[in-house]
């Protein structure tokens, strides 16, 4: 299950993402105006309250906590496409979106960053591609210096987490 879906079930994120303004100005615009790779838009949702677990049978948390959430569409990489997306175009799209995600987090003063799999699960995106893009900005470009902690979504996407860990360990 995608990280955003888990957050929607465990917090008030869903209500924030379904505000009439966002539906009218972001989702509807995205459907009409973007190509097959979707939109580069990011939705910043500050102060979302996580109040229950994301277990099969959810359990209320004894101490709810707040997080800021960045929502950004991952390009849909369907390996069964009639016309595959050129690898350069796909890499450019991931690089652009990952840079935007990190810059929005930095601009809003995020101390901690949890890296989702960004399409490496249900969308079949190459873990090496996504991990490589994160590494480029976090390590090579020094974006990691803006955060106190950078964590992986430990509960999901082991294949992606291994690729990310391997690339992040190659720090110079």
PLM features: what roles do these ranges have?
Residues 1-113, 117-172:
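Macrodomain-like recognition of ADP-ribose-binding/processing modules
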């Amino acid at each position: 299950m995608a990280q955003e879906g888990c957050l929607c079930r465990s917090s008030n994120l869903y209500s924030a993402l379904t505000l009439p303004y966002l539906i009218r100005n972001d989702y509807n615009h995205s459907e009409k105006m973007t190509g097959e790779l979707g939109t580069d838009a990011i939705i910043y949702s500050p102060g979302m309250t996580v109040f229950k677990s994301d277990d099969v049978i959810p359990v209320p948390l004894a101490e709810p906590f707040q997080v800021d959430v960045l929502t950004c569409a991952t390009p849909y990489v369907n390996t069964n496409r009639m016309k595959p997306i050129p690898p350069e175009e796909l890499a450019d799209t991931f690089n652009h979106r990952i840079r935007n995600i990190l810059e929005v987090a930095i601009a809003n003063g995020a101390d901690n960053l949890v890296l989702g799999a960004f399409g490496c699960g249900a969308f079949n995106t190459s873990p090496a591609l996504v991990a490589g893009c994160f590494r480029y900005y976090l390590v090579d470009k020094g974006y990691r210096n803006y955060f106190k902690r950078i964590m992986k979504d430990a509960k999901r996407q082991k294949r992606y987490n291994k690729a990310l860990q391997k690339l992040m360990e190659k720090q110079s």
